[in-house]
Each structure stands twice: as C-alpha cells, then as structure tokens.
C-alpha cells in the first residue's frame, strides 16, 4: 500500500458535489486547515472516483477495510489515529476523504499542488484497485435539482460566486414554495422589467419557469443584485450573504 506523509487538508463536510470541494487556490484564511501525518493512497477507476467525489453514498466495504486505522492526523503535537481516511485518485482527479466514523465520504478535501504532483508521480505506474461493488451503485443515478445545481450551472464560477448562486436558488426555492402569484410576478419584474405587461396574463407556474430558466445560467452583477434584494429581511439568508461578502478571497 502507498502512503503520503505531512498532507495538508481543508475539509469540506457533507458536500455531495465535487465542485464545492475547493481547490487550493480557493482556500481561505478562515478555513480550518489540518495536517495528516500519514494517509493511505489508493488508485481507483474513474467511475469509482467520480462516485466518491460527487456523492455521499456507501463506500465499498473492501476499500474501507483496506484503509482501516491506517491514517493519522497531527494536532497540537499529538498523533491521532483515524478510522477511515485516505487519498484517492484515478490518475486525473485527486481527493482526500474522511468518513468521520461513518461508511460514506463525509469530509472531502483537495490537496496542495506540490502534494498533488507527488500523487501523480507515485501512481503513474500503478494499476487501479478493483473493489467488489454493485455497478448500479457506481453508475450513480443522481439527479440535480434547485438545491443541488448541476455542475454545468456553476462551471467557471469562483467559490464566492458558487456560494452566492446557491444562496439565490435557496431563496428562489422558498419563493416557489409560497405559490403566491403576486409575489412571483413582483420578483420576476425585478429581474426582467421589460416583461411587465406580458406576465399579467401568465400563471404562477409560467412566471416561475421563466424566472428559473433566466437565472440558472452563469453569474453576473445582475444575479448578485437580484439575490441581495430577494433575501432582504430574512435573517438566515442575510447571514449567509454576509459570510460570503466579508470574505476577502474568491
């Protein structure tokens, strides 16, 4: 078995989408970065890597057994054993994983560039490990939705933009749940005032569909301003907004 030593990790907890597990250039000063004293390194198939990176489902039992209690974290000069922590790669993507006592990839992290390069060098002549695992589980039938946007809808965005876009769609999801035609008409007019006359003859669902379809792609100052206005007076959303806008990086 291959091992890495002195690996810096920045855990993102409970993230089912790999795009929210930020690469090193998007790490922030306020992130809690930890040091893995020792961690197993596994090369797996691209299908399994994608499954681990983009899901929160059960990991293969054989994989968990293989890495059991072979990783250590160093905190305050103390070396603590971790039950199931490992670095996994398919030769292209690289991810550190910690199950936090469960059997799913609860915590995920990217590595710093120097250590990513080391991983590539270590696995270049290594065959991918195979694990007994139901193919239908590997070919995850995951469906993206308004609270878990498809990667194509966040591609090219910075960490801050991704977080604000997710906040916008949390607020839009709440707006949809109200099923209030007057309110959805008001907010659609805020987004697209040129449609004021046309939407007078439209149903709630028709207006909602237009608002969703017009806001789902990309991110712009228009999106940002709309989000800021939409969440005003809602303490939970306002707090999330403040967290992102206080951050100085990305």
From Swiss-Prot:
Highest taxon, organism lineage: Bacteria
Q: Which family does it belong to?
A: Belongs to the UPF0736 family.
Protein name (record): UPF0736 protein BLi01230/BL03322
Q: What is the lineage of its organism?
A: Bacteria, Bacillati, Bacillota, Bacilli, Bacillales
């Amino acid at each position: 078995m291959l091992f890495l030593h002195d690996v810096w990790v920045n855990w993102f907890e409970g993230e089912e989408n790999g795009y929210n597990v930020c690469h090193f250039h998007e790490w922030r000063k306020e992130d809690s970065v930890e040091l893995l004293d020792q961690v197993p390194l596994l090369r797996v198939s691209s299908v399994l890597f994608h499954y681990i990176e983009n899901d929160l489902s059960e990991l293969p039992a054989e994989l968990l057994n293989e890495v059991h209690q072979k990783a250590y974290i160093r905190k305050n000069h103390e070396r603590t054993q971790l039950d199931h922590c490992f670095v996994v790669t398919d030769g292209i993507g690289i991810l550190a994983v910690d199950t936090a006592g469960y059997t799913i990839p609860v915590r995920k992290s990217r590595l710093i560039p120097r250590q990513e390069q080391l991983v590539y060098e270590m696995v270049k002549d290594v065959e991918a490990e195979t694990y007994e695992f139901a193919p239908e589980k590997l070919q995850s039938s995951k469906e993206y939705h308004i609270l878990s946007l498809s990667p194509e809808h966040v591609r090219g965005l910075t960490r801050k933009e991704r977080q604000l876009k997710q906040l916008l769609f949390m607020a839009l999801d709440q707006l949809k749940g109200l099923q209030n035609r007057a309110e959805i008409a008001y907010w659609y007019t805020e987004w697209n005032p040129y449609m004021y006359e046309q939407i007078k003859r439209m149903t709630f669902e028709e207006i909602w569909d237009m608002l969703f379809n017009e806001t789902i792609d990309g991110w712009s100052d228009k999106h940002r301003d709309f989000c800021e206005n939409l969440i005003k007076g809602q303490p939970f959303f306002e707090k999330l907004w403040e967290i992102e806008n206080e951050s100085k990086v990305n």
